[in-house]
Structure formats: structure tokens, C-alpha cells
A protein has these predicted regions:
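Active-site loop-to-helix "anion-binding N-cap" substructures in soluble metabolic enzymes
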Residues: 1-230
Length: 230
């Protein structure tokens, strides 16, 4: 679980080389109200003391649970953005257990993870639904964080490039070049969630493949401008 100190250290590391970065901490199903309160207190203090956001263009986001989004938004200062973990592409309806893009937008929460491997598997989120959600968020001046990644079987079969390219093409189908630049892409190899970790050369090769796919779909400039996270 990400601590306030670990996120602060990540900010230090990336901003030492390049100001124009994005860091998002996914809390998953962690942190109750008191935990959020304690995290926000320490995090706000660290950022204020070192004046990170005054010196950098780094975008910092946290993705709390559905219940944690509003208290996190109220407690976290210094322009830290709150990111939803999942949203539905319909404004409202008979979708038990979901929250809509429009509902979070009403509370000025304008970012959401889309297609995280856990929502793909546990909620049976399809490529078509991911595409619809990305489009409706972009239409409403919101920022989708597209999550992509391959399984251990796909990685061992050397199908990483093919898998992530297909995920990107399906997710951004019908999305213009200008809108594609607003999408954040997060690479999360499913096989590396937990005990295993992806090496720097593996991550770099996948990021290169992501930009190659975007260049083929759009152009080199679009591929350069899209933020890619690991």
C-alpha cells in the first residue's frame, strides 16, 4: 500500500529529471476514513514543507475507494487530484454496484482508472465498455487513465506487444488524435502484480511498443505527448 512518504519519494525521483510527469497511487480496497485523514495530514505536510508542486508540473493523483473519494478530495491539498478506480459510461440506470462518470464529475472528480486488470476480470468489463467510457469521459472534459497489461501466459509466449497493442486499438477506437493526447495510459503487467516485478528493460521495451502503436494509429507527435505510466 502506498504511504505518503513513498509517494513523496517517487515525486522527488521523477522531478529530478523531468518536470512534466504524472504519478498516480492506486489505493485499491484500502484505507478507511481515519487512514485517509492520517495520510492526508502527512502528505500535505511533506508537500508544503518541500514545496514540490510549486517547483514542478508533476501531476499527483490518488485513487481511493468509492467511499474514500470525497473525504480524500476534501482533505488533500496542493492540487493533488482524486482519481476514481472505475466508472460506468451511462449517466444513470440499473447498474448496481457502479458509479457513473457524471456522478463523480458533479463532485469535481475528473479522473478515473479505466480497464484496470482487476475490474476487467472481477467485473467482466469488456473492451467495448472501456471504449465507451473513454469516449464519454473525453466528451465531458474528463481524463481517462487507460490500464493495459498482459498475463503471465502472454508474457511467456512473447505476446506482450500484440496484447497491449490490441488493447490500445480497441480502447481508442474512434478517438481523435487531439483527444488521444488527453488520455493517460498505465501499463500494469498482470504477472508482475504482487511478488514478481518487471525489470527496467522490460518496462522500457513495452513503453516503446505503446508509443509505436500510438504512432501507427495517429502520428509521432501524438505518441510523444501521451503520458505513459508504470
Amino acid at each position: 500500500v502506498c504511504t505518503a512518504q513513498s509517494v513523496k519519494e517517487a515525486i522527488e525521483k521523477v522531478t529530478s529529471k523531468n518536470n512534466n510527469k504524472v504519478i498516480i497511487a492506486n489505493w485499491k480496497m484500502n484505507k478507511k476514513f481515519e487512514d485517509i485523514k492520517a495520510y492526508a495530514y502527512v502528505f500535505n505536510k511533506l508537500l508544503k514543507r518541500d514545496k514540490f508542486l510549486a517547483k514542478t508540473k508533476t501531476l499527483i493523483g490518488v485513487a481511493p475507494t468509492m467511499l474514500g473519494m470525497l473525504p480524500a478530495a476534501a482533505m488533500l491539498k496542493n492540487n493533488v487530484v482524486v482519481v476514481a478506480q472505475h466508472v460506468h459510461y451511462e449517466k444513470s440506470g440499473a447498474f448496481t454496484g457502479n458509479v457513473s462518470y457524471d456522478q463523480i464529475h458533479e463532485y469535481n472528480i475528473n479522473y478515473s482508472l479505466i480497464g484496470h486488470s482487476e475490474t476487467r476480470s472481477m467485473m467482466n468489463v469488456t473492451e467495448g465498455q472501456i471504449n465507451k467510457t473513454i469516449k464519454v469521459m473525453l466528451e465531458n472534459q474528463m481524463v481517462p487513465v487507460l490500464c493495459i497489461g498482459e498475463t503471465l501466459e502472454q508474457y511467456e509466449a512473447k505476446q506482450t506487444g500484440k496484447t497491449i497493442s490490441l488493447q490500445i486499438m480497441n480502447a481508442l477506437k474512434g478517438v481523435s488524435s487531439e483527444n488521444a493526447k488527453k488520455v493517460i495510459i498505465a501499463y500494469e503487467p498482470i504477472w508482475a502484480i504482487g511478488a514478481q516485478t518487471a525489470t527496467v528493460p522490460v518496462i522500457k521495451s513495452v513503453i516503446d511498443k505503446i508509443r509505436e502503436c500510438l504512432s501507427d494509429m495517429y502520428d509521432e507527435q501524438t505518441a510523444k505527448e501521451v503520458h505513459v505510466l508504470y
